Amino acid sequence: MLMPKRVKYRREHRGRMKGRAKAVRI
């Protein structure tokens, strides 16, 4: 949606809930 490439990289690097929550906040 907004940036699936960055969200996927951050989700795997930090966590599933943290990556999703940050993607929704941005």
Swiss-Prot record:
GO molecular-function terms, A-Z: rRNA binding; tRNA binding
The entry's keywords: Ribonucleoprotein, Ribosomal protein, RNA-binding, rRNA-binding, tRNA-binding
One Gene Ontology term, aspect cellular component: ribosome
Region (Disordered): 1-26
Keyword tRNA-binding: yes
Coiled-coil parts of chain: none
Subunit record text: Part of the 50S ribosomal subunit.
Function description: Binds 23S rRNA and is also seen to make contacts with the A and possibly P site tRNAs.
Family: Belongs to the universal ribosomal protein uL16 family.
Name by which UniProt lists this protein: Large ribosomal subunit protein uL16
Species annotation: Geobacillus stearothermophilus (Bacillus stearothermophilus)
